[in-house]
Amino acid sequence: MYSSIVPSSSNGYYHQSQYQNAHHQHHQQHYHQQSHHHYNGAAAAPVINVHNYHFHTGPVNNQVIEQHYNHHNHVQQTFEENIPQGPHSSFNFSHDFPQQNNSETHLNHMEPSMTPMEHQNSGSSTPYPFEAKLFVPSPAASVSSYSFSSDLSGKDEEDPRIPLKDRGRVYHPQSTEKPKKVPSKRRDKATLDRLRVHKCFYQGCGKVYTKSSHLTAHERVHSGEKPYPCEWPGCSWRFARSDELTRHYRKHTGAKPFACKECSRKFSRSDHLQLHMKRHETDEQDDGMDDFKDFMTFI
C-alpha cells in the first residue's frame, strides 16, 4: 500500500471534504434511526461511508483530487434527492396475503372422490389424488360363515352313521355324547326262538339251531367225530367242521384274506378283523372329540 502524498495547495479542499463527509454520515445515521423507529423487523445496520477510505496505488496529483471531489458531490446529490420526505409508513401484509377464514370454502371446490378406474376413464389431465382408505371388515364376515368341508375317502362315505346330507363333509360331533350305534342285522330273541327248530337230543344238552348243518356239526362234538383231516404234509390235525379246517389250513399257507379298510393290516380270521375294527371306532371317537375341542377353541 502506497502512502498518499497531498500537495499543500489542496489543504482547503480536504477540510471542506471532511466537513461534508461528517455531515453526510450524520444524515445517514439519522435516516436509519427513523426507519428503525417505524419498522421493528430488523436492527439498524451500521453506516459505512466508503468515501472516508482513500486508497491510492500511486502518487496523488491535483487531477485525481478534482475527479474524486466531483464524484463525491454527484453521489451526495443523488442520495439527497432519493431520500423520502415525511414519516415512513409501516409495512402491511394484509393486502398481499389474504387470509382464508373458512376452511370449508376450499373443500367445497374439491372434486368428488373417484376411483382410479373412473378417474382414468374420465380423461382428466389432473393427477389422481391420493386417498387413504381404511379397510373395515363387514359384520357379516363371522366365523360361522366359513365352511369346513373337504372331500373324504370312500371309507367315510360308506359309514352308515353319517347322514346322506352330511356325507362329503368333515364330520364334527354336535355334542360330547357318543354316537348311537346302528342296530345290527341279527334277529331278536323272539324271532330266533321261532326259527330254532333243530334241537340237540343228547342227554343234558338242550341247544337248538336254525340250520340242520349247524346241528350236525354240534352233534359231532358229543360223538367225537372229526371227518375233516388236514392234508398238509406232516400235519395230523382233524376237524369236525369244514370251516375249522379252512381256518387251520391258512396257518400253513400264511394267507390273510381279511384286510382292514382303515389301515394296511390283514388277518386270517374274520373275528380277528372285527376286534381290530372296534379299535378304529374308539380312535374315531377320540379324534372327533379332538376336532370338536379344536373347533370350540377356534370360535
Swiss-Prot record:
One of its GO terms (cellular component) is nucleus. SMART domains: ZnF_C2H2. A zinc finger (C2H2-type) spans 198-222, 228-252, 258-280. It is found in: Nucleus. The keyword Transcription applies. Keywords: DNA-binding, Metal-binding, Nucleus, Repeat, Transcription, Transcription regulation, Zinc, Zinc-finger. Residues 153-180 have a biased composition (Basic and acidic residues). Disruption phenotype: Lipid contents in the intestine increase by 44%, but increase is less in response to high levels of dietary calcium. Residues 19-38, 146-189 are annotated as: Disordered. Expressed predominantly in intestine. GO terms for biological process: regulation of gene expression; regulation of lipid metabolic process; regulation of transcription by RNA polymerase II. Induction: Expression is repressed in response to high levels of dietary calcium. Residues 23-38 have a biased composition (Basic residues). The keyword Hydrolase does not apply. It comes from the Eukaryota. Its main location: nucleus. GO terms for molecular function: DNA-binding transcription factor activity, RNA polymerase II-specific; RNA polymerase II cis-regulatory region sequence-specific DNA binding; zinc ion binding. InterPro entries: Znf_C2H2_sf, Znf_C2H2_type. PANTHER family: KRUEPPEL-LIKE TRANSCRIPTION FACTOR (PTHR23235), KRUPPEL-LIKE FACTOR 2 (PTHR23235:SF62). Belongs to the krueppel C2H2-type zinc-finger protein family. Probable transcription factor which regulates lipid metabolism. This is Kruppel-like factor 2. It comes from Caenorhabditis elegans. The lineage of its organism: Eukaryota, Metazoa, Ecdysozoa, Nematoda, Chromadorea.
